[in-house]
Swiss-Prot record:
<comment type="function">
    <text>Associates with the EF-Tu.GDP complex and induces the exchange of GDP to GTP. It remains bound to the aminoacyl-tRNA.EF-Tu.GTP complex up to the GTP hydrolysis stage on the ribosome.</text>
</comment>
<feature type="region of interest" description="Involved in Mg(2+) ion dislocation from EF-Tu">
    <location>
        <begin position="79"/>
        <end position="82"/>
    </location>
</feature>
<dbReference type="InterPro" id="IPR014039">
    <property type="entry name" value="Transl_elong_EFTs/EF1B_dimer"/>
</dbReference>
<protein>
    <recommendedName>
        <fullName>Elongation factor Ts</fullName>
    </recommendedName>
</protein>
<dbReference type="InterPro" id="IPR009060">
    <property type="entry name" value="UBA-like_sf"/>
</dbReference>
<keyword id="KW-0251">Elongation factor</keyword>
<dbReference type="InterPro" id="IPR018101">
    <property type="entry name" value="Transl_elong_Ts_CS"/>
</dbReference>
<dbReference type="InterPro" id="IPR001816">
    <property type="entry name" value="Transl_elong_EFTs/EF1B"/>
</dbReference>
<dbReference type="GO" id="GO:0005737">
    <property type="term" value="C:cytoplasm"/>
</dbReference>
<keyword id="KW-0648">Protein biosynthesis</keyword>
<dbReference type="GO" id="GO:0006414">
    <property type="term" value="P:translational elongation"/>
</dbReference>
<keyword id="KW-0963">Cytoplasm</keyword>
<dbReference type="Pfam" id="PF00889">
    <property type="entry name" value="EF_TS"/>
</dbReference>
<dbReference type="InterPro" id="IPR036402">
    <property type="entry name" value="EF-Ts_dimer_sf"/>
</dbReference>
<dbReference type="GO" id="GO:0003746">
    <property type="term" value="F:translation elongation factor activity"/>
</dbReference>
<comment type="similarity">
    <text>Belongs to the EF-Ts family.</text>
</comment>
């Protein structure tokens, strides 16, 4: 059966697949449009399953502010090229809209968009993963995106400009906690044990070593907390000192960066080429 251009066009519009893939699918089903769509969906699911093992450590961070809250979303792909693709970004924004509208869990988002994800994997040829969604509440909040890769939302009792600048600071300085006293006891204990061992190995007298550890611990908790860090806008002040002068306060923040915590595969191209040359000599 001859396949018409109109049939190919219709299938392409309904599936988003390439023209040649649509023509092939229609030829295999003798022009049965619905069967072609079913077969393409099955093929897409198979491709997605094969791609599932590929490391998706690139992607985008998106933010949307709601009434008294904000949502941050990370969607991953494998390359920065696809991270800029309109189809990928359209999918990510669709997920973001649903998250912002209903504050659903990550598991529910994944389930709701699985069919669309599978279709996108089949279309672009890369693994796609809806990795993280975070919600943060606050009557006053400000958000900041650094490119497509870092997203921050800060909440607190301050004007919008101040919160915006603090969000930029969080993006650059990567604090883990709001205040030094917020650092968990187990984190403090682990660092303290390490500093005691370092001081002992340095051969310092016990009283001096004790003072050194106290100073180092103060520095440690300050460096990983927002209010203890030097403020990037006014480096001679800590963020805490700046907030005190402004009569302002930060209550919470969330910072997401694309791919953080994902173990990336390191490609050794020299070794790969050498192996290919060796294999060709044996052939």
């Amino acid at each position: 059966m001859a396949i018409s251009a109109a049939q190919v066009k219709e299938l392409r519009e309904r599936t988003g697949a390439g023209m040649m893939d649509c023509k092939k699918a229609l030829e295999e089903t003798n022009g049965d449009m619905e069967l072609a769509i079913d077969n393409m969906r099955k093929s897409g699911a198979a491709k997605a399953a094969k791609k599932a093992g590929n490391i998706a450590a690139d992607g985008t961070i998106l933010i949307k502010n709601g009434e008294g809250f904000a949502v941050l979303l990370e969607v991953n792909c494998q390359t920065d090229f696809v991270a800029k693709d309109a189809n990928f970004l359209g999918f990510a924004n669709a997920v973001l809209d649903v998250a912002a509208a209903s504050k659903v869990t990550l598991e529910d988002l994944k389930a709701q968009f699985e069919e669309a994800r599978v279709a996108l994997v089949a279309k672009i040829g890369e693994n796609i993963n809806v990795r993280r969604v975070e919600y943060i509440d606050g009557a006053k909040l400000a958000s900041y995106r650094h490119g497509e890769r870092i997203g921050v939302v800060v909440t607190g009792d301050a004007d919008e400009e101040t919160l915006k600048h603090l969000a930029m600071h969080v993006a650059a300085s990567k604090p883990e906690y709001v205040n030094p006293e917020d650092v968990p006891a187990d984190v403090v204990a682990r660092e303290q044990a390490l500093q005691i061992e370092i001081s002992m190995n340095e051969g310092k007298p016990a009283d001096i070593a004790e003072k050194m550890v106290v100073g180092r611990m103060k520095k440690f908790t300050g460096e990983i907390s927002l209010t203890g860090q030097a403020y990037i806008m006014e480096p001679k002040k800590t963020v805490g000192e700046f907030l005190k002068e402004k009569g302002a306060k930060v209550t919470n923040f969330i910072r997401l960066e694309v791919g953080e915590g994902i173990e990336k595969k390191e490609e050794d191209f020299a070794a790969e080429v050498a192996a290919q040359i060796a294999a060709s000599k044996k052939a």
